[in-house]
Amino acid sequence: MEITELFSKIYGEGRPLIILHGLFGMSDNWATHAKIFTQHGWQVHAVDQRNHGRSPHTTGHNYDEMSSDLERYIRRHNLNNVVLMGHSMGGKTVMNFVVRLPSLVDAMIIVDIAPKAYPVHHQAYINAMKSIDFTKDNSRKAIEAKLSKQLNNPGIIQFFMKSLYWKSREELAWRFNLSALEINIDEIGAALDYGYYNGPSLFISGGKSGYILTEDHDSIYEHFPQAGIVTIPEAGHWVHAEAKDSFSAEVLDFLETL
């Protein structure tokens, strides 16, 4: 299914920096960093990918489709000299995009994801969210309590809670399309198994994450010969949230070279 228009929040004026969130995330997750980057001459487009946030829901959810969504967004907004940044699933979208359409991109930043395949490891989260019956669990407090009984991770629970909204006056709902994401979970973990991008590239990994290992570096350089790889030791997978200042500094240092 073709997406007609992705939702985005646009901050500031200047050269375009497009940010793509990760699985179960949305553009709001990047508001703090967007405001920081606008202070350095960048117009930040924080985009909701398909099946997330305020963007349309669809049954399809793979990286070719999400890359095509991004292409339409760039062309519709008449953006030039674009820098792309993506976290986790968003990083896979960016990698797919730049090997297919390198002429539309000046540089890319990938946050805590490698081009390799990742085994399915989100099922506990999916099961916990599927257990919510919005016809009965009709308050944020009740939903948080139910999730807390199944997930021993307050940070993850609060991350999910940000995607709750009032579908009607009486009923809450997830902004993401949980059923489509579960059906396509293998696609979300798929490897980038073709192509290369020879433009400026930065990979930022969390030292406590385990998503980018030393043995992944060869694959990164194979697809992205100009890549720089930096590790923020104190951060886990949500590098931008767990080490905000260090992360912003690494990104800004890279952007200043462009």
Give the predicted meaning of each segment.
Residues 1-18, 39-42, 79-80, 224-225, ...:
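Alpha/beta-hydrolase fold catalytic core
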Residues 14, 22-25, 88:
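Active-site glycine-rich loops that stabilize anionic/oxyanionic intermediates
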Residues 20-22, 205:
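The conserved beta1-alpha1 loop
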Residues 31-34, 39, 43-85, 89, ...:
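Active-site loop/oxyanion-hole signature of alpha/beta-hydrolase fold enzymes
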Residues 96-99, 106-137:
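Flexible "cap/lid" loop of the alpha/beta hydrolase fold
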Residues 169-223, 228-231:
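Conserved serine/cysteine hydrolase catalytic core
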Residues 235-248:
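Catalytic histidine-centered segment of alpha/beta-hydrolase-like enzymes
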